[in-house]
Amino acid sequence: RNSAENMLVEILLSDQQCWKHLLEWEGEITPRINVIIQVSREILSKNLHLTPTNLMREISTTDTNEELNRWISELAMKDISHLAQEKRELIFQDCLKKIHKICICEKLDDIKKQMTTKKNNGLQYHQELETLQTLLFELKKE
């Protein structure tokens, strides 16, 4: 998960064309990537460029967690310019798909735990079962 997130953000910070793909992404994402998406939309609404500096500045005004800014700062220092544009786009799409799959698997684990708890307490778990089936179907589409 971390390696996919890291590579995704490294590419984002070095390639402006990938922002559009991320902002249009409809799959599952991690909480950190979700914050980046929300903040990037704020930046764009102010007619600013999506740069590491603007991203970190906007995050610091909306999120008190310095860990996210530190993470972005570290990734912004990495040089991936040696990768060809096509290769970067392919890796970016692969990272999005991997993050999507990981998030679905994490949700599946959570639903299974909820079902087990309800089963052990003698409660109905039909809603969890439906959610589980939906997630399994989504995972199978991958």
Language-model-detected regions and their locations in the chain:
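Bacterial replisome coupling helices
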Residues: S45-E142
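Non-catalytic protein-protein interaction segments used by genome-maintenance enzymes to assemble
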Residues: R1-H49, I72, C105-L108
